[in-house]
Amino acid sequence: MDKTIKYVGIDIQGRRVYQGESGRLYCNTVTFGNRPPHYCTKLNNDFDGEPDLDMPQNWNPTVMDDNDTDKNTI
């Protein structure tokens, strides 16, 4: 499981997509509201693929935001 993920864009369904140190793609399936993020892997590691496996609720990666300068833990 990756400990750091980097924001890489938004998929065709409006989900934020991240890439881990291993190259694995993840998405946040919470696209609105004030709820905590819910991460899943991407099916076949495809940027626009469907969410696949749920990440454990206690998985708390360091997220590099879209400008690559700030690190935030969520």
What residue ranges belong to the model's regions?
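Cysteine-centric segments in proteins
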Residues: 1-74
